[in-house]
Amino acid sequence: MKGKLYTKKGDGGKTSLFSGRRAEKFDPRVAAVGDLDELSASIGLARVAYPPSNDLLRSIQRALYVISAIVSAEQRAIDVKFDATEVEALEIEIDRVTAALPELREFIFPGEAEPSCRLHLARAVARRAERGIAGLAEPAPPEAVLAYLNRLSDLLFVLARQADQSGGSTESCLRT
């Protein structure tokens, strides 16, 4: 017989971190892990809506699980590698996608087509996850984690623009 999904250990408003520490569900570290989970789900929706980015977004979801483990582990040693090479991989993708896009001279509004809207939503969730992790007290996550989330929101922005362009949508711009 399989075990039950629920344990009832969280019914009192606490949960367990990967470090083993019991924490209030409103603890900033628990909230940060929740934001990363929401980001991964948002990226999953974007993958479904914009198949050309499926493999790239799937690899990002994997990276987000590693980041979640790092954040949840606190000071506990875990056998994961997350460094500047992860950030550099995103930068390469940002540059590749940007090179094929028209120059952006105005602010754009999300909402022209579903694929770009889902990518923009994931971008906004990435920004929130970045803010939550940036606010964590000791132990702070590795610098590469914050840099990765910062680049990720940039990548999601250019992918949203690419989705609009490849789908034949015209970007809705704010005239300044």
Predicted region positions:
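Phosphate/pyrophosphate-binding loop motifs in nucleotide- or prenyl diphosphate-using proteins
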Residues: 1-176
